[in-house]
Amino acid sequence: MTRVCDIERFLYDWAPRDLAMPWDNVGLLVGDSGAEVRKVLVSLDVTEAVAAEAAAMGADLIVAHHPLMNCAWHKVQHVTADDAQGRTITTLLKNNVSAICMHTNLDAAEGGVNDALAERLGLQATKPLTDEKIGRVGTLNCEKTLVEFLQDVIKYLGCNGLRYVDCGRPVHRVAVGGGACG
């Protein structure tokens, strides 16, 4: 039997808690660590709609990127149906759905969010952008104009709009940073 704590441990093996920024709130945020898990819903955020979907599909666990209570200093003062967060937590608890969130630790982890961005853009010889390992910097396999590089960004990341200033310099070294990086 797989339990919530087993999945949390597996996720921490990939993206350790100590990679999270000090202000971040990661791990099991709602639910029972000992509960059995048969169905998991994966989501970017834990919203009212996601909680309702998890309940409707009979999920035992939501694994999300963004924390439900988004900062370590955000101490829940109340849980009521008067606001979206309260309704979300109430729905989860009523339906025995736990929620694990892996945020900046997943951004920083080897093979995590920033490595995925760098790989998608074809960056080579990547290394962490900061001491906290948030972001990555690497090189393209060949120089490109900014417009050529941005066409790749649109193509490989599915962007529908970009703002830029073309200084006429070729692009060879690129930094990427998802979420908390900037």
What are these language model-derived features?
Residues 1-182:
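Hydrophobic structural segments
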